[in-house]
Swiss-Prot record:
GO molecular function, one term: phosphopyruvate hydratase activity
Organism: Thermoplasma acidophilum (strain ATCC 25905 / DSM 1728 / JCM 9062 / NBRC 15155 / AMRC-C165)
Textual note on the cofactor: Binds a second Mg(2+) ion via substrate during catalysis.
Known catalytic reactions: (2R)-2-phosphoglycerate = phosphoenolpyruvate + H2O
Pfam hit, one: Enolase_N
Free-text function comment from the UniProt entry: Catalyzes the reversible conversion of 2-phosphoglycerate (2-PG) into phosphoenolpyruvate (PEP). It is essential for the degradation of carbohydrates via glycolysis.
Main location, first listed in the record: cytoplasm
This protein's name: Enolase
Coiled coil feature spans: none
Record's signal peptide: none
Binding residues annotated for Mg(2+), in chain numbering: D233, E274, D301
Protein's pathway: Carbohydrate degradation; glycolysis; pyruvate from D-glyceraldehyde 3-phosphate: step 4/5
Family: Belongs to the enolase family.
GO cellular component terms, A-Z: cell surface; extracellular region; phosphopyruvate hydratase complex
């Protein structure tokens, strides 16, 4: 069956931080797809390049002059072929000409257009009969590169295990609110800020943040009679300087960082631990996983950057038991799907994730279902975050009706 691409348009739009990003429209017979690409603040060294080194306008110009003509008429049902064509025309190996964000927008828009033409939802088109609804994982206290004057650890996370996805998402909101009240009581004369992902941001030590997080979780869990997991994203690359991990009030050696990551599981009951080590330290990750992987998820984000080859290396070294998936880290839906397949075959869980600079696009909601994700990491509040949460709630309704 052929489904020729009839038209493609790309444009600049704004993301949730007010920065320019790209949006792509793809038209096929009886189908249309539109995708706006997100952007990260904390990015891995091995991610594809978001835009041409000359900027977003240069990426768009490269598309118009070098790419568009080759895509018109291409069979939209051949997703892997389309994505390979994007990669080949770019020719750089890391999308430094077209830009990984524009590649992501194009790749996802083709999938959306094909799904609409076939009359099926995107999650079904990408994932087939798979119909696992993930649990929402949302950040409630922020620091690192996502918030000024916040904690050294970039994200403190919660995931409620309610009877439905929407109930779970709402309980995460209640934890967020309770933490806001607690911080207002603790810092009566200081204005409490919010970070890029609508987390609370204030000059706290990491230990104080753990205490407040656990107190809020305990209270809401008791009130709602629901289990609530806690988690962190160390974003250790942003802490790493000259072989050390530099926090606000202390500096840790590699061995001390490993011990610290292990201790938060034991001392604070943290279940989800993302990027506890620098992104080349596969062995450091492996030591943490070997010691606490039976009771905690050790998640690779910057370690893997959704790159199938890096995930294969992690599998070989037993570095983690879970992987974060972000399409615009690797540039195409096909490559992200391969990353999930490699991880799943090795028995690793996957978590589909947003970026700090988001849009109201909801494609990651569909991917989290299509990929059978254990969690979907997409914040707690804010229109660009809630757009994904509400879409998963709608998908759950369709699957259970």
């Amino acid at each position: 069956m052929e489904l020729p691409i009839e038209e493609i348009k790309v444009r600049k739009v704004l993301d949730s931080r007010g920065n320019f990003t790209v949006e792509a429209d793809v038209t096929v017979p009886n189908g249309f797809g539109r995708t706006s690409a997100p952007a990260g603040a904390s990015t891995g060294e091995t991610e594809v390049i978001a835009f041409s080194k000359s900027g977003i306008d240069a990426s768009i110009q490269f598309f118009e002059s070098k790419v568009k003509r080759s895509l018109i008429g291409f069979n939209a049902l051949d997703q892997s072929g389309f994505d390979k064509l994007l990669t080949d025309i770019d020719g750089s190996g890391n999308f430094s000409n077209l830009g990984g964000n524009l590649a992501t927008a194009l790749s996802m828009s083709v999938a959306k257009a094909a799904a609409q033409s076939l009359g099926i939802p995107l999650y079904r088109y990408v994932g087939g009969i798979r119909s696992t609804i993930p649990r929402p994982m949302g950040n409630v206290i922020g620091g690192g590169k996502h918030a000024r004057n916040g904690t050294s650890i970039q994200e403190f996370l919660v995931s409620a295990q309610g009877s439905t996805f929407l109930e779970s998402a709402y309980i995460n909101v209640l934890v967020h609110r309770r933490i806001g009240d607690m911080l207002s009581d603790k810092f009566k004369d200081i204005s409490i800020g919010v970070g890029d992902e609508r987390t609370w941001s204030v000059n706290l030590s990491d230990e104080e943040a753990f205490e407040i997080l656990n107190e809020a979780v305990k209270e809401i869990s008791s009130e709602k009679k629901v289990k609530i997991y806690t988690g962190v994203d160390f974003a250790a690359d942003s802490l790493y300087e000259n072989g050390k991990y530099v926090y606000k009030h202390t500096t840790k050696s590699r061995d001390e960082q490993i011990d610290y990551a292990i201790s938060i599981s034991k001392d604070f009951g943290v279940y989800y631990i993302e990027d506890p080590m620098y992104d080349t330290d596969f062995d450091g990750f492996a030591e943490i996983t070997a010691r606490i992987g039976d009771r905690s998820l050790i998640v690779g984000d910057d370690l893997y950057t959704t790159n199938p080859d890096r995930i294969r290396k992690g599998v070989e070294k037993k570095s983690t038991n879970a992987v974060l998936i972000k399409v615009n880290q690797i540039g195409t839906l096909s490559a992200a799907r391969e990353a999930v397949a490699v991880a799943t075959f090795a028995g690793m869980k996957n978590i589909v994730s947003h970026r700090s600079g988001e849009t109201t696009d909801d494609f990651l909601a569909h991917l989290s279902v299509a990929f059978g994700s254990t969690f979907v990491k997409t914040g707690v509040i804010g229109g660009e975050r809630v757009a994904k949460l509400n879409e998963i709630a709608r998908i759950e309704e369709c699957l259970t009706s």
